[in-house]
Amino acid sequence: MRSICFNYINRLILLVALALTAAVGQAQLLRTSYFMESAHYRMQLNPAMTPSRGYVHLPAISNIGASYMSNGIGLADLIDIVKNSDEADYFVSNAFMNRLKDNNHAIANAGTDIFAAGWWHGKSFMSLNIGVKVDGSLRAPKSLFSFMREMRGMSTIDYSNYERHIGNEELNVSAYTEIGFGYTREVNDRLSVGGRVKGLLGLGNAKLKVNKAIVKTNLEGLDPNYDWTHGDPAEVLRAKGTASIDVEADLESSIQGLNLLTNGKGYIDDLEFKVSKMGIAGAGAALDLGVAYRITGGLTLSAAVTDLGFIRWSKGSTTVAHANTSDLHFDTEDEGDLMRFADIVNNTQPLNGDLLRLRIDEQAAKARTTSLSSSIVAGVEYAVNHDKLRLGALYSHHNDPVKAQDEITFSVNLHPSSLVDVAVSYSPICCGGQSVGVALKAGPLFIGTDYIYTGKNTKCCNALFGLSIPLGKASKSN
């Protein structure tokens, strides 16, 4: 019988999936907006890139979006993995396997503003924001899904000398509230510098890392194409020999109100979440810094680093667990022993809780510190026709626990009037040269994407929709 243990891991995967696909897209993901003069969303990328006018966000209908990016796992594939059932068979598809890379990762950085406003005061621009952000990422090597196919009997296996390594999996999710104050100063007609100081209130953080997972068998008399999920158990009982599972994995969770429950053997097999006890699990701070310099009348260089910060999670909200597979050695001389092995390897979940056997380590629980996923951008733009046409190129680097992302975005921006700003972009790296973006700012309305949706199994897609009220008059320098 499948252990309930996996339910906890599956919920963590679901939480990451929500971070990747829920309606949250934060402006820092929308590179297409970077050279749009009237779009205040670009300040999330560089606090020195001020909008032409102040603004007030409309609560609940501003900064609504979604974002997903992966090098190998398509959006539809991710949904199949997350909603995985006992009879899941997505991994038996050759098309699915052909889409995968040797090392697959999926990354998202998302958030929404509860309140945000910005305004000009002379040559200074100031802003306030209160928002919620979620960072999520996962890593899953192709060997993991190859192992699942082997256990379905899709490969000819010599079980008398079988060894499969399926480690190097990782899952991260972090949610926090951000309270920020930004200040930008036009030092002169050429130079602008800006910064944003942010206080962070941690809502929750979880990290699961599988360093190694090794499955070995020395079994005689077993069909080389035996299906451990649907095969006849009598065939397993006729086999002779030994098998073993060796895992190194760690789980760190800092969420107020979450209790991990264990079975009689001390392994996590369920969770209890009390909404009444949900609260602040940690606190921290972060800093954004940016600069923009106009070299000539039309040529401007800019650069920024954002989300330089940390969150310190409290000891009282933290639970630590480690894999304990010391007793996962099986011998057909012991009655029913090999059936225990079968119950583990026939699990069709990509992160198999029966295999990990996570045991809470109360002595290891302590306050812990995590870093934010910081970003670096550097841009160059050339404006002509009284700034009504802008040509831009933006380099961006985003740090993430599972994979750093680099991208170059080329854009053409049209600004025919103070009410309308349009941009079209092309980003050649992350999505194999198939990423065209577009953004529109028309009065209070903003809508944009870096990756126009190309189908249900796209590997890169995002969208951002927002409504804001213009505040004050346009800066004289814009």
State each model region's role:
Residues 1-31, 380:
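Bacterial Sec-dependent N-terminal signal peptides
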Residues 28-478:
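Subset of outer-membrane beta-barrel
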